[in-house]
From Swiss-Prot:
HAMAP family: MobA. The gene is mobA. One of its GO terms (cellular component) is cytoplasm. This is Probable molybdenum cofactor guanylyltransferase. It is an enzyme of class 2 (transferase).
Length: 199
């Protein structure tokens, strides 16, 4: 089966106040920290106004949401990755998760079993659908939901076969799953990162 790595970087960042993907932390942009957990061959899905900025930073495979679903959130991003690339299994990660470890993503990929449509971790009781593995066969379900403007990812998970994994069972640290929505979240990064051993 062919694997594709997908970084979702199309959020409006309203609560943060500026595009989170490009905010610098420890000398690197947040999206670069997240991308490190995926590997070099990564497709980025973003907003039209950010495409040039990613390309200027050396990113070659950057796409905007496929029509007619532009700006319709993470589901549109995942659908676009399916549509634009030739793969079977898609490792999906949000760009605002700078502490996620590569070993965690590899463990999730390893746990994709026959018949499952997705592998989704749970950390501290929170389901993490944007740090997950999806099979391309869910594309028709995604299309239907987007067409109906049902944009909640929890609705998608309710319609497909999901293998849920407790983060501690794959040796993942809860700190890995912090996602940066606000300035307060960003200010906690240093403290959270101190509890991690980087790969």
């Amino acid at each position: 089966m062919k694997h594709v790595n997908v970084l979702l970087a199309g959020g409006a960042s309203r609560r943060f106040g500026e595009p989170k993907a490009f905010v610098k932390w420890k000398g690197r942009m947040l999206y670069e920290c997240a991308k490190e957990a995926l590997g070099e061959q990564t497709v980025i899905i973003s907003r039209p106004e950010f495409i040039d900025r990613f390309q200027e930073n050396g990113e070659n495979e950057v796409y905007q949401d496929a029509e007619p679903f532009q700006g319709m959130g993470p589901l549109a991003g995942i659908y676009t990755a399916f549509k634009k690339t030739d793969g079977d299994l898609y490792t999906v990660l949000s760009c605002d998760t700078p502490l996620i470890q590569r070993r965690t993503m590899l463990e999730l990929k390893r746990l994709m079993i026959a018949g499952a449509d997705a592998v989704v971790p749970i950390s501290d009781g929170q389901v993490q659908p944007l740090i997950a593995i999806y099979h391309k066969r869910i594309m028709p379900v995604l299309y239907d939901q987007l067409s109906e403007k049902r944009l909640r990812i929890s609705d998608l998970l309710g319609r497909i076969s999901v293998c849920y994994v407790q983060a501690e069972n794959i040796g993942a640290n809860p700190a890995e799953f912090i996602n940066i929505n606000t300035r307060d979240d960003f200010s906690c990064l240093e403290e959270k990162s101190n509890s991690l051993k980087r790969d």
